[in-house]
């Protein structure tokens, strides 16, 4: 380990409009890049994740054995030291990391940033510790990324920071370099379009989940206690490994190709999972509560076995893209544990998998599972030029394995509405000038006279 003594603190780094749960501050950045020890990833150590074809593969994962403080360049101070370690994976559009031993001490600060210093994530500190002792990060732009760790010297003995996997993004998943702009004008509407105006709450329930070098879509889901437990439901074939969840990854205009501010969280536990060949669902839970600043909506659901009809919408991250909406369903049918139907506007494609469709009551009825067509080019164009049916795993078929979590009060209800704040919706006339105005109503039911 290279040790350098230095007295000054230099520049603060700029950030892009993104946040993982982090705790402020900026990297020390008190070293010349040329002084940092860089580790080049051995691409022969690739992990074969054997992803399902409905999972969008955006990255290769490589197995590593990296004890960060042992291999880092150290800047030693009288009371605290800062460690810098560079990770290089040639050709990557972005890099992400999985730490299989992650236990930061009380006064530790961890940042991760690109060599060009155009973005950083962090700080991470002891509040990011979790019972699993692991952490997966969001992607950071560049194929050369720096890990910076500042820790009081007396706390070093208690630190655990070991990296086991490097995720090499070859697709430019988050469009840092503009490589995917052409793909973003597909046949699904942006959720900022007027077609999504009546579905704003449901839009805010849908998230993107990355793990194992692939991405799927999913939904934050409510439970009968209305207690804002951070449950997420998606497809069994998406589940596995360390996950990072992306919130609000969506355009701010109907024709926009790039997102506004978005947020991420990492660290999940699997609560219930089916066999994707006959019951394709998985219920997971984030290790931490979702911050109120993320504006999340906890979607309602229905376990009814009756047909939802054709007035349904799907909301999803098709091709790992900014959030989209599909609508005008036709041919609604039932086949075992699946609902089968097509969309007149929009298509489910890899990356959409696990996403919810909502019935006319704006409740989840199923999770995207498969498509009745051949898998083709990574570009959405080849899917948009076809007309085909989609298979959604029935929410009702998963119920017997998820009811302990989604009905913790044993109400045995068949459906509930969603919530933002833990309060149940009260339906009535919300027009204060109407003769039957209900001052307690939170949702207008169309009854105003």
Set out the residue ranges of the language-model regions.
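A short aromatic-anchored loop/beta-hairpin motif
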Residues: 20-88, 168-187, 192
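Short, surface-exposed beta-strand/strand-loop-strand elements in extracellular ectodomains
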Residues: 103-118
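C-terminal subregion of chymotrypsin/trypsin-like serine protease catalytic domains
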Residues: 232, 258-265, 274, 358-425
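Bacterial Sec-dependent N-terminal signal peptides
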Residues: 1-24
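Catalytic nucleophile loop of clan PA
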Residues: 219-229, 346-368
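Primarily marks secretory-pathway-exposed extracellular/lumenal segments that are disulfide-
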Residues: 14-19, 416-449
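Serine endopeptidase catalytic core focused on the charge-relay Asp
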Residues: 140-215, 219-341
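Beta-sandwich interaction modules
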Residues: 116-146, 150-155
């Amino acid at each position: 380990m290279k040790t350098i003594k230095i007295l000054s603190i230099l520049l603060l780094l700029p950030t892009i409009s993104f946040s993982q749960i982090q705790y402020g501050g900026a990297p020390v950045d008190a070293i010349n890049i040329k002084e940092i020890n860089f580790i080049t990833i051995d691409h022969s150590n690739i992990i074969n994740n054997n992803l399902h074809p409905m999972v969008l593969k955006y990255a290769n994962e490589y197995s590593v054995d990296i004890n960060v403080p042992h291999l880092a360049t150290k800047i030693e101070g009288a009371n605290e030291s800062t460690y810098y370690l560079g990770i290089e994976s040639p050709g990557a559009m972005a890099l992400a990391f999985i730490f299989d031993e992650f236990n930061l001490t009380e006064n530790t600060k961890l940042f991760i940033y690109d060599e060009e210093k155009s973005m950083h994530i962090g700080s991470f500190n002891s509040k990011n510790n979790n019972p699993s002792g692991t952490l997966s990060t969001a992607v950071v732009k560049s194929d050369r990324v720096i890990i910076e760790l500042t820790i009081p010297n007396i706390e070093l003995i208690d630190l655990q920071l070991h990296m086991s996997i490097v995720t090499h993004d070859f697709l430019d998943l988050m469009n840092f370099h503009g490589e995917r702009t052409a793909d973003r004008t597909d046949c699904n509407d942006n959720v900022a379009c007027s077609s999504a105006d009546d579905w704003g709450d449901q839009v805010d329930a849908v998230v993107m989940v990355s793990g194992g070098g692939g991405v799927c879509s999913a939904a934050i889901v409510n439970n009968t206690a209305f207690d804002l437990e951070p449950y997420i439901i998606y497809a069994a074939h998406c589940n596995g490994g360390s996950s990072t969840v992306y919130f609000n990854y969506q355009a701010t205009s109907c024709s926009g190709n790039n997102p506004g501010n978005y947020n991420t969280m990492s660290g999940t536990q699997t609560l219930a999972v089916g066999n994707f060949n006959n019951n394709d669902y998985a219920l997971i839970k984030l290790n931490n509560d979702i911050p109120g600043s993320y504006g999340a909506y906890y979607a309602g659901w229905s376990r009814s076995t009756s047909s939802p009809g054709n007035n349904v919408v799907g909301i999803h991250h098709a091709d790992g893209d900014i959030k989209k909406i599909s609508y005008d369903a036709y041919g609604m049918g039932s086949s075992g544990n699946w609902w089968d139907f097509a969309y007149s506007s929009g298509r489910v494609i890899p990356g959409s998998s696990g996403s919810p469709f909502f019935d006319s009551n704006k409740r989840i009825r199923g999770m995207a599972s498969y498509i009745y067509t051949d898998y083709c080019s990574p570009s959405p164009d080849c899917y948009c030029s076809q007309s085909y049916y989609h298979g959604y795993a029935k929410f009702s078929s998963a119920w017997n394995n998820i009811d302990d979590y989604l009905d913790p009060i044993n109400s045995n209800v068949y459906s509930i509405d969603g919530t933002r704040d833990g309060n149940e919706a009260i339906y009535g006339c919300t027009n204060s000038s109407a003769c039957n105005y209900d001052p307690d109503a939170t949702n207008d039911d169309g009854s105003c006279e």
